[in-house]
C-alpha cells in the first residue's frame, strides 16, 4: 500500500513539473536571443593602435595602415601605397594627420612616414623604390594630432643634429632630469612630396617648424597629450607662457635652450599651478576646458583660448581643498566610478556634451553641464548627479542611447575599452561646447552651431583576454547597435 502511494505522489509531481514548464512564459528570453545582433567578422584583425579622419577617409592602424571612405559602408582596406612600409618587422604604432591632406605613420626605431590622402602630391607613376622617412624623424617614438600633427623625440637622442629645434642632448647621464622634445610638423614638410600643402624641407633653417622642450622631473614622467597652448604628461599639465623669461630651465646639456636657431625655435611651457592626483592617465580638451583623468577622478580646468596671448596657465579654484564636497572645488572635479580607467574622450551632438571614460569593462559617461564659469574663471561643468556609472542611467541623447543599452552590455560593455574615437561626419558637426538640459534631437547650439547636425560616429578600440573580440568596434546609427568593424 505504501509503495502504491509513493508511486502516485511521484506521478503527480512529474505532472506538475511538466505543467509548470509548459505554462512558463519564455517569450522574453527567446525574443532577446532572436533580436541579438550578429557579430561581424572584423575587417581589421587584432589590436587597434590609432584612428584618424583625413579628408573624406578614415585611417586606422593595427601595425599596418588601413583606410576606408568616411561616409561609405565598405570594409577597411590595407593602404598599398609605397609611401608607408608594409614589412612585417616595421609596425606602425601611431598615426596622426593635418585633417585633410596627409597622414603620418610612426614606426618606432625607424622614423615617421607620410601618406598623402587621395594621392595628392604623388608622382605620376604613384610608386617609388621604397618608402622614406621624414627629415629628422629617425628617433621619433610616436606621432599625434588630428589637425596640427607632431612627433615625439625622447631626451638624449640628439646625435644627428637638432634639425632647427634648438638645444638638444637632454637627459645626459650627468643629470637626473631630462626633456621631452615635441616636433611640430608644418604643412608640406619632409621627403615624400608636399601633398599639395606647399612648404617643404622639414627641419631646415628656412622652415616654419619648431620644437617644444618640456623639462621633466625624472624619467618616470611620460608624455600623454598636447594641444593648442598646453602639454600633458603623466604628472603635470604644462601651459604656454608667451614670455621666454618665464620659461623653464634649459634642458640639461642642451646649450641654446631652443629658440635661437631654426624657424620659430622653442616655445616656453611651464607647469600649471593646478595639482592632480598622479599618475595622470589621459586628458582631452574641447577648446574651452582641460579634462584630466586619474584613477578615481576627472578634473576640469578652464583653458585660456585667447589667440593673441600665448595662453596663460590654466586657472584653478582659489584655495583648493582635497575634499570634493568643498564649495571651492564644486564642479571642478568628480569621482568617475569607472574601474581601471584607460582613456578619455568628448562626444558632442546637438547641444549635448559628454565625457566618455573607457575602462576594464566598457565605458562610463559624465554629462557635462552647460558652459558656465564660477569665481576665478573656474569651470562648473562636473556634477556628481551627472556621473552615469551604468548603462541604466543613460538617456536617449547619450552616445549609446538608452534603448541600445542592453545590446551594449552584451558586447562592448563586457570588454576593456582601451581607446574611444569620436569622428564627425563631413558636412556638419557641433564643434563648440554648448549646454542644453534636455538635449532635444534638433536643438541648436547656443554658440551659433547648425540646428540639425549629423550625429558623430563613435568607435572603440576593444581589448579582450582571449583576443576573440579584440579590435575596432563602432556604434552603428542605422541599426542602433554596437558591432565590429
Swiss-Prot record:
Name the predominant localization.
Answer: membrane
Compartments in which it is found: Cell membrane
Taken from the UniProt entry, a GO cellular component term is: plasma membrane
Specify the signal sequence span. Answer: 1-23
- Give start-end positions of Low complexity composition bias: 308-327
Record membrane topology: Lipid-anchor
Identify where the record puts lipid attachment of type N-palmitoyl cysteine: 24
Q: Does the keyword Membrane apply?
A: yes
Region annotation Disordered: where it falls in the sequence: 308-331
- UniProtKB keywords: Cell membrane, Lipoprotein, Membrane, Palmitate, Signal
Q: Which family does it belong to?
A: Belongs to the TP013X lipoprotein family.
Q: What name does UniProt use for this protein?
A: Uncharacterized lipoprotein TP_0136
Task: Provide the organism lineage as a comma list.
Answer: Bacteria, Pseudomonadati, Spirochaetota, Spirochaetia, Spirochaetales
Amino acid at each position: 500500500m505504501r509503495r502504491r502511494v509513493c508511486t502516485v505522489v511521484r506521478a503527480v509531481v512529474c505532472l506538475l513539473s511538466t505543467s509548470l514548464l509548459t505554462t512558463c512564459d519564455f517569450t522574453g528570453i527567446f525574443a532577446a536571443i532572436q533580436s541579438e545582433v550578429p557579430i561581424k567578422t572584423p575587417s581589421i584583425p587584432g589590436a587597434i593602435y590609432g584612428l584618424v579622419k583625413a579628408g573624406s577617409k578614415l585611417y586606422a592602424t593595427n601595425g599596418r595602415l588601413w583606410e576606408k571612405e568616411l561616409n561609405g559602408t565598405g570594409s577597411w582596406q590595407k593602404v598599398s601605397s609605397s609611401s608607408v612600409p608594409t614589412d612585417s618587422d616595421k609596425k606602425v604604432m601611431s598615426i596622426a594627420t593635418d585633417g585633410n591632406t596627409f597622414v603620418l605613420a610612426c614606426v618606432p626605431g625607424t622614423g615617421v612616414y607620410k601618406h598623402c590622402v587621395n594621392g595628392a602630391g604623388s608622382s605620376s607613376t604613384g610608386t617609388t623604390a621604397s618608402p622614406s622617412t621624414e627629415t629628422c624623424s629617425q628617433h621619433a617614438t610616436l606621432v599625434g594630432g588630428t589637425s596640427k600633427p607632431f612627433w615625439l623625440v625622447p631626451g638624449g637622442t640628439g646625435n644627428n643634429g637638432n634639425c632647427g629645434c634648438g638645444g638638444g642632448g637632454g637627459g645626459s647621464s650627468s643629470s637626473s632630469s631630462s626633456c621631452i622634445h615635441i616636433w611640430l610638423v608644418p604643412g608640406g614638410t619632409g621627403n615624400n612630396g608636399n601633398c599639395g600643402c606647399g612648404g617643404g624641407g622639414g627641419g631646415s633653417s628656412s622652415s616654419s617648424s619648431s620644437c617644444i622642450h618640456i623639462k621633466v622631473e625624472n624619467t618616470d614622467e611620460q608624455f600623454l597629450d598636447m594641444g593648442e597652448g598646453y602639454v600633458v604628461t603623466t604628472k603635470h599639465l604644462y601651459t604656454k607662457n608667451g614670455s621666454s623669461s618665464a620659461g623653464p630651465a634649459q634642458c640639461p646639456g642642451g646649450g641654446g635652450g631652443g629658440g635661437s636657431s631654426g624657424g620659430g625655435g622653442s616655445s616656453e611651457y611651464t607647469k600649471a599651478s593646478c595639482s592632480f592626483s598622479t599618475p595622470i592617465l589621459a586628458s582631452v580638451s574641447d577648446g574651452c576646458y582641460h579634462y584630466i583623468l586619474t584613477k578615481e577622478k576627472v578634473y576640469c580646468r578652464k583653458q585660456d583660448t585667447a589667440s593673441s596671448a600665448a595662453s596663460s596657465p590654466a586657472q584653478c579654484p582659489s584655495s583648493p581643498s582635497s575634499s570634493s564636497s568643498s564649495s571651492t572645488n564644486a564642479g571642478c572635479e568628480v569621482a568617475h566610478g569607472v574601474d581601471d580607467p584607460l582613456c578619455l574622450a568628448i562626444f558632442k551632438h546637438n547641444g549635448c556634451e559628454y565625457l566618455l571614460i573607457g575602462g576594464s569593462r566598457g565605458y562610463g559617461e559624465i554629462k557635462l553641464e552647460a558652459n558656465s564659469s564660477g569665481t576665478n574663471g573656474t569651470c562648473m561643468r562636473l556634477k556628481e548627479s551627472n556621473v552615469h556609472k551604468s548603462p541604466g542611467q543613460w538617456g536617449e541623447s547619450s552616445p549609446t542611447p538608452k534603448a541600445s543599452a542592453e545590446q551594449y552590455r552584451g558586447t562592448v560593455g563586457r570588454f576593456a575599452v582601451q581607446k574611444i574615437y569620436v569622428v564627425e561626419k563631413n558636412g556638419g558637426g557641433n564643434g563648440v561646447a554648448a549646454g542644453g538640459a534636455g538635449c532635444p534631437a534638433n536643438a541648436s547650439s547656443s554658440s551659433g552651431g547648425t540646428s540639425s547636425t549629423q550625429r558623430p560616429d563613435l568607435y572603440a578600440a576593444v581589448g579582450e583576454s582571449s583576443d576573440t573580440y579584440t579590435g575596432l568596434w563602432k556604434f552603428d546609427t542605422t541599426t542602433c547597435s554596437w558591432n565590429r568593424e
